Structure formats: C-alpha cells, structure tokens
Amino acid sequence: MKPSILTKLAQLSDRLDEVTGLLGDPDVTRDMDAYRRLTREHAELTPVVEQYLAWRQTEADLASARDLLDDPDMKELAEAELSDGQERLAVLELELQKLLLPKDPNDERNIFLEVRAGTGGDEAALFAADLFRMYSRYAERNRWQVEIVSASENDLGGFKEVIARIVGFGAYSRLKFESGGHRVQRVPATETQGRIHTSACTVAVMPEADELAAVELNPADLRIDTFRASGAGGQHINKTDSAVRVTHLPTGIVVECQDDRSQHKNKARALAVLAARIQDVQQRARQQKEAAERKSLIGSGDRSERIRTYNFPQGRVTDHRINLTLYRLDAVMDGDLAELTDALTAEHQAELLAQLAGD
C-alpha cells in the first residue's frame, strides 16, 4: 500500500482514539450538538480503523510466515499461510481504498426528481408518467416518501413535466446517476399500424438543499407571479390565485407550483425547488470540469447525454454509460432498479479508485 495512504490510516486510527475519549468526557456529553457530531464521526471512523487494524494484523502474520520459510519442518505450512495471507491482504487493501474514497456530501440527502417529456409528443408524456411510476415504486421499495410538488398532465394521463420531492435517507446516493436522457422504443397506445416509435424524456435528480439559506436567494433577483391553478385540459381546479411561478432573473430558472390550495405552501415549495436547481447548476459545472479532467462518463452531470434505452418489444433496458443490458424490462419499470444503481455506483467507485491510484 502507498506510504501516503498508510500515513492517512494511522492518523485516522489516532483520531478514533481521541474521539472515543471525548465521548466519555462529561463536558462533551452536556453539549448535544458537539456530542452528535462526535458520535457521527465515531461511526464513520470505526469501519475504516477496523479494516486498518485487520490489515496490520495480516501484515504481521505474513512476516511471521516468512520467518518460518527457513524451517524445513514448517516450510509447507508457512507457504500455505503466505498464499492465504496475501489474498486476504489484497482484499483488505481494496476495501480500505474504497473506505477512503471522498464522500459526496449530498449522498444522505432527500432529492427533487424532475421528469420531462421530450421528443415524441403524447407518447413521450406517457413514457414520462411510466418513468415517474418506476421511480415512485423504487422509492416504495426503500420505504421513502414521495411528494408531488408540481405536475403538468396531458389529456391521456401522461406528464409533460412532473416534479417530486423524495424523502429518505440516502435517496441522492442511490438515484444521482439517473440524470440524463432516457429513450423508449415501443408501439404507442395511439398507434394503429403497430409501428415502433422512439420517444425521449429527460430526468433530473437534485439533492435538496439543507436550508434555503444554503443557497443565497436575493429577493431582488426573484420575480414572483401568482395565477389560477388548472388541471389537465385547462379546467380550473381552484378559483383563487393559489398557483405560484418564481423566476430567478440572473439564471432564467423558472419554477411553477400549483398542487396545493395554499398560495403560501406553493410559494415555499417553489422556492425549495429553485434553491435545489441553483445548487444543481453549480454542482454540475463542477462535475463537468472534473469529468473533463478524468474523462469520466459516470457522474459527469451532462443532462443532454442519452444514458439509457428502454426497448419494449425486446424486453430489454440498456445503460449506455456502462454497456449494461438487462432483459428484465418489466421488473425495472416496476421499480426494481437495484441492479442498475449498484452497477453505476460500482463503476463510479472504480473511476475514483483509478484516480486515487494515479495521484
């Protein structure tokens, strides 16, 4: 293992001892904020240090086995121990490197999910509704809560655009690689000749800002309009101006919210989505810069990139970034995304490990 990594691990081991001591200090336990911070740090450090101590023990066992190689009576046993120990050491080194990878500070956060119909007219809107159902079912599987913030439906029950807040620990870490272009190939319900059509939708996954204060929203930069909320086909569902449209003048970002009968609640939701979008723009700019430097496809933040194709006649889904094809489209559309999300996370980790090895 690289000396710089060993130095870092030794420092983390010392820090764990220090944190353990502080958690037993009555003065610290009286300060709940400090106690919570230290408890979280202790939980983060413990698995790293445990693996490090296991690595050190394996290194010591290997040294003992090497000493026995000169003993004719023990040579065969020593060689077997060396072989096993070296395999164990390689596994421990890989696990330690993964544990040392930089943590995404947004991983534990709730998210705002946006699905927009692209090319394909009504069929694209129907596919947007299918995608939204897919993510909603995935959220249910993880016992997360889904709250629709804003939805624009067409007459066939599809979504021109739908924005939802998904509340659940680690939601961003599991869904952050879903942003991008999603393409569908199938025979639309409106097609009478049985021809396969290709349509597309765009998905955006944004971490919820901790607080609105985390993103500076200068009131002078905002234009807030109110209007009557309307349902599919333009029918009014509310006779008061409860719907809210917020425009962020410096960026041109526009957020509409009309799902609640309360103008106050709609405004609060719209501002929360706006804060997430502004934060997302800043984050994607950083990601694209980093991705250009390391020629990464995963987590590049490029929303124009076509990331996945759903082919209904063949029952397959293909993620183009990692060349993964699954012939279980029905299960995927029902929210069984674990195989996809796990593979994308593993690929991202591999990219980070390669970067770590090159540093």
UniProtKB/Swiss-Prot annotation:
It is found in: Cytoplasm. Keywords: Cytoplasm, Methylation, Protein biosynthesis. InterPro entries: PCRF (IPR005139), Pep_chain_release_fac_I (IPR000352), Pep_chain_release_fac_I_sf (IPR045853), Prokaryotic/Mito_RF (IPR050057), RF-1 (IPR004373). Methylated by PrmC. Methylation increases the termination efficiency of RF1. GO terms for molecular function: translation release factor activity, codon specific. The keyword Ion transport does not apply. Peptide chain release factor 1 directs the termination of translation in response to the peptide chain termination codons UAG and UAA. PANTHER family: LD18447P. This is Peptide chain release factor 1. The lineage of its organism: Bacteria, Pseudomonadati, Pseudomonadota, Betaproteobacteria, Neisseriales.
